[in-house]
Amino acid sequence: MNYKELKEDYQKKVDSLHFMVALSKKWVEELFKLKQNHQKVYNIWGGCYADEENYQKLNQFTQDFENYIKNKIKEQDEEFVKGAVYYEMSNYEYPYSRDAEEVLNALGFDEKIFEDKWFTEVWTKAEKQLLSDYDW
């Protein structure tokens, strides 16, 4: 499985979950009903909420996704890791911003990953490839 396929699989799993968006009176009322029934409600991002079950599933899906990438790094699967870095660099317009933080966040890492010499070499290869492919 390449990175794009992994990401699409992750997205399908996330899309199967039930989230509430508290942007309308109806959904705010639903949140209050859950709380009144002593159910835990979690704020997951940008006005989205999940009950305990969906929150736990989201965390598990995310952990599985990130662990898959970590294992590919541990295995030194250059094709997969370079493809993942390239994909996220493209997704976050890295050639313009040169903001590694957004790319790393999408992959489940922070700047500490650059302490891994092998990863840094693969990052550099993906960056060079992207810059040569980019339509300036």
Residue positions per predicted region:
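Soluble, non-transmembrane alpha-helical interaction regions
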Residues: M1-W136
